[in-house]
A protein has these predicted regions:
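Structural register within alpha-helical repeat arrays
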Residues: 29-30, 64, 96, 129-130, ...
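Residue-level signature for tetratricopeptide repeat
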Residues: 32-33, 67, 99, 133, ...
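Register position in tetratricopeptide repeats
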Residues: 36, 70, 102, 136-137, ...
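Canonical positions in the second alpha-helix
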Residues: 50, 83-84, 115-116, 149-150
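Short coil turns that delineate tetratricopeptide repeat
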Residues: 55, 87-89, 121, 155
């Protein structure tokens, strides 16, 4: 419900051509949403608006990296990532692994995903990201083993069951 309200407020301000205030986290959510529905031009406009309202926010660079990855420019994304300072280590690892997948450097993406998984515990968002990266790199069996281990610790985590299902589906394709 909160995101729908945010999206409605954003779309209304765009339709009316007025500038409305949005927090940087709201811009991050809006950009992610528009990339998920294949509207990279709108995502670029969101990034511009975020830079205008929050010129010093490090999230702007992170959003630009996401946009570059979406647009098939992983080398530029990596260069931007390497220039980032004051970024959370987990977030840095996640973004770097996504860039390595885009560059088709699956071994390095795998190693980063394992490092990410070693720094996480069941229930943390980064465990799902690490498992998804392993799947993206073709390491479905390893992802399944890690997922099953995590489920022994936290069987109530529905997202882990979903990732396990993805692993099993991927293994059937092989």
């Amino acid at each position: 419900p909160e995101f729908r309200e945010l999206l409605a407020r954003y779309e209304k301000s765009r339709q009316l051509g007025i500038s409305s205030y949005f927090g940087i986290d709201e811009f991050v959510d809006l950009l992610s949403y528009h990339l998920s529905i294949d509207k990279s031009d709108e995502a670029a406009a969101i990034l511009d608006a975020a830079r205008h309202l929050h010129p010093t926010a490090p999230e702007n660079t992170k959003m630009e990296i996401r946009l570059l990855l979406y647009n098939g420019e992983p080398q530029k994304a990596l260069a931007l990532l390497n220039g980032l300072k004051f970024i959370d280590e987990i977030e840095l690892l996640t973004i770097k692994a996504e860039i390595m997948v885009a560059l088709r450097n699956f071994r390095q993406a795998h190693d980063i995903a394992i490092e990410l998984l070693q720094k996480s515990s069941p229930g943390q968002e980064c465990i799902y990201e690490g498992l998804e990266i392993l799947l993206d790199c073709g390491f479905a069996m390893e992802a399944l083993e890690i997922c099953e281990t995590a489920l022994r610790v936290a069987p109530e985590q529905i997202s882990l069951h979903e990732v396990k299902a993805e692993c099993l589906i991927e293994l059937q394709r092989i």
